[in-house]
């Protein structure tokens, strides 16, 4: 697997998504949570989830080739 392969990108996106999950959870528990920051992070997480879904579908299509 090279540094620019779709599989590598998938791993990177999953890692970034997991990091965002942890950050969002930690910030949400804070008593003085910055709501604007939380919304931005959640929006970024959703965008990552969409990218992950598209890439997973491209790498593993349901229909046989």
Please name every model-derived segment.
Residues 1-65:
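Extended, charge-rich alpha-helical interface modules
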């Amino acid at each position: 697997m090279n540094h620019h392969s779709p599989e590598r990108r998938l791993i990177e996106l999953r890692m970034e998504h997991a990091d965002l999950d942890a950050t969002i959870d930690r910030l949400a528990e804070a008593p003085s949570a910055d709501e604007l920051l939380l919304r931005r992070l959640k929006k970024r997480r959703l965008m990552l989830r969409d990218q992950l879904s598209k890439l997973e579908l491209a790498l593993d299509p349901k229909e046989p080739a």
